[in-house]
Each structure stands twice: as C-alpha cells, then as structure tokens.
A protein has these predicted regions:
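C-terminal catalytic domains of large/alpha subunits in multi-subunit enzymes
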Residues: 1-175
C-alpha cells in the first residue's frame, strides 16, 4: 500500500505500441495487431447525484456507419452505468442468486443524455476504409467515469461495484 500512496497526485502518460507484422507477411506466427481504439468518458451528475449527461469520446477510426456507432456507444455507456450503479448479480457457490427481473437494469426513464464524440484523424489506417471498430470499448471507461463523478460530487472514494451511497442505491432501498 505504501507504494500506491507514493503515487498519489502524480499523472502518468503511456503510449502502447505492439510490434506487428505487415498484413500478408510471409512469416511464421505473424502478429497482426493493426489498430487500437481509444475511449474516454466524462459523467455529469445533477444536484441530487443522478447521472444527467455522459460525454463519450471514441477514436474508432473512420466512422462508416454513424447510426451503428451511436447505438454501440449508447449501449456500452448504459451497460457500464448498470455495472457501476444498479446491477448486482450475487453468486453463492457459483450459482446466481438473482433473476434478470431483479438484476437492476436501468429503466428507460433513467437513461441520461449521451453525447457520442467521434474522434477521426486526417490520416486513416490502410485497412477496411480506415475503420478501427467499436464494441466493448464503449463499456470499459464508464464505471470509472461514474466513480470519478461521484468522488468530485461528494469527496467519497467508492471501491466496489455497484457503487454505494448514490442516488440509485438510495432509490433502490425506497422502491
């Protein structure tokens, strides 16, 4: 723990470059990592602590189908919000103790405004019309962004999912 405490307040920057072989290279066991996406999300809470807006910026290469990428980002954000705030799937000896009806999926009335931001570079990759793809990456940054929003809102650091002492956890106890 002391090592982690020493890192408090520092910023870290990292660039990931995986060696890759040229597409179609005649080499044994070629490495074909051709592209990587990037995503970052910012969550805005209202005065009650309810998520009112999510800004989701994604570098997914060239946007080929805007409707599909919008849907993928919105679905990923909602899935990440569920993990962060409302969904609980307790297990006992590996057996689920909840049913889908009691899982805590978001209600349609609880869906915040989601702003999808497409980051497209002038220089496109020489594959598949410059597209990188969008998928699970839309879910990954959401829960940390929700935790960061709550930490900024009330100063409490929550370390487990679903997050406790939120607008949503308090509402669950009332319903």
């Amino acid at each position: 723990m002391a090592a982690l405490a020493a890192l408090e307040g520092h910023e870290f920057y990292y660039e990931y470059l995986e060696p890759t072989d040229k597409l179609g290279a005649d080499v044994p066991n070629p490495k074909s990592h051709i592209c990587y996406g990037f995503a970052t999300h910012v969550v805005i809470l209202d005065d009650e602590g309810k998520v009112s807006e999510v800004y989701a910026a994604h570098d997914s290469g060239r946007v080929i189908n805007p409707i599909a990428i919008q849907g993928q980002i919105e679905g990923g954000v909602l899935m990440g919000m569920g993990y962060a705030l409302t969904e609980d799937w307790p297990l006992k000896d590996g057996v689920p103790q909840a049913k889908y009806g009691t899982l805590g999926l978001f209600r349609a009335t609880d869906i915040p405004q989601i702003h999808a931001i497409y980051v497209e570079k002038d220089e496109q990759l020489p594959v598949a019309y410059g597209g990188k793809g969008i998928g699970e990456i839309a879910t990954i940054p959401t829960a940390p962004a929700v935790q960061n929003a709550y930490h900024a809102w009330d100063g409490k650091l929550r370390r487990s999912l679903p997050l406790s002492d939120t607008y949503y956890s308090r509402r669950a106890h009332r319903d």
